[in-house]
Amino acid sequence: MEHPLNIYNTLTRKKEQFIPLHEPHVGMYVCGPTVYGDAHLGHARPAITFDLLFRYLTHLGYKVRYVRNITDVGHLEHDADDGEDKIAKKARLEQLEPMEVVQYYLNRYHQAMDALNVLPPSIEPHASGHIIEQIELVKKILDNGYAYESQGSVYFDVEKYNKDHKYGILSGRNIEDMLNTTRALDGQDEKHNAIDFALWKCAQPEHIMRWPSPWSDGFPGWHCECTAMGKKYLGEHFDIHGGGMDLIFPHHECEIAQAVASQGDDMVHYWMHNNMITINGQKMGKSLGNFITLEQFFTGDHPSLQQAYSAMTIRFFILQAHYRSTVDFSNEALQAAEKGLSRLMEAYGHLMKLQPSATSTVDTKGLREKCFEAMNDDLNSPIVISHLFDATRAINSVKDGKATLSEEDLKELQEVFHLFLFDILGMKDEASASGNHYEAFGKAVDLLLSIRQQAKANKDWATSDKIRNELTAMGFEIKDTKDGAEWKLSK
């Protein structure tokens, strides 16, 4: 490829050049949501992070098969091996079938992802649709001697596995420390060690979600689904596995152990993890009850929110930080993101209307290369955005008549701005995204301003002022320029 991409591999703890196993094909698996409630800001971050990667790999010419799963069974409370299934609990509380809960929140998740301009994955498999594959995985691990059956459940034997391999290779945790510090919880005396994790759980009589297996009527452990579905759709070895940093342990650590125990080696070449969204310094999440849903951001209906924020403001807010750095929620940061995005969108609008000159007095030639350089440095989206802001200053100088752009440079700047702002960063002009209604609405405002312009030419100041004052009262900002009046909706 013309542009070598380097990404940070959590497994090796360093940036590495991305070399696909089967170029030009790329296999990418990302852990999706457990659908028992509305998506919140913490769900938006991995979705947007790996959407950025998906878009960029596609732009570089790779043929990406992007698999993002839906967890609809087996994810117990507190991410543990005991307690109630999160979806079954929600179903019981709302007196619904578990799959009604799944479908309702999955529909709402998709709506939120559409609003955030997150592209759909190539495949979106459900854990409940792959029980057979998970049972086969458990059988292989048992046959290879790294699991044991106990009272109808099957557990992964971490201590035995660690004698032949290395448990903790991803998270850097030491098994001796874990053996000494992990306490056995009530109801887990069927395990050899407290750190052993469930591959299959025997269902209690009241447990609704259950399937027959060689060991009992039950359900798979949470960690099995990604190993089984990753293998089914991407093969025994694939390029990228992504997810939030909170999944490194235990979920992804257990996935590596399952893969090695079942087939002799890890399935994944590059492990990638986005950092957390925090609120008052704590991870935002359902389990802590400190989350704000995306719907609440879009409507402003939450006591912590000073206003509503658009989906593109949320996306821009997340992309303004590098995906491996923490992002702390605040109204001030979101309002700054809103203003910054508005500046870029306005600049793009001006850019598309600029007229070329014979020569250029501003240098735009390095912009494309600088943006690619930032993206190739582990998807450094904040640096890309800073380069676009630099270009915005040049655009405004040309617009104000203080600088010029040749036809060639103008075309290059238009192409690069569009490529990075829309195609790669995945932003969209929310005003124009509403389609024909907005177009008709815009034409109506333009018509009023042309009538005002004619009134000014006729020295009919009363009509001119009336149109301006009425539009201002409705929330429009009117700016008179040498080329006529410009307008935008003010906040």
UniProtKB/Swiss-Prot annotation:
Its main location: cytoplasm. A motif ('KMSKS' region) lies at residues 283-287. Binds 1 zinc ion per subunit. One of its GO terms (molecular function) is cysteine-tRNA ligase activity. It is an enzyme of class 6 (ligase). It is found in: Cytoplasm. GO terms for cellular component: cytosol. PANTHER family: CYSTEINE--TRNA LIGASE, CYTOPLASMIC, CYSTEINYL-TRNA SYNTHETASE. HAMAP family: Cys_tRNA_synth. This is Cysteine--tRNA ligase.
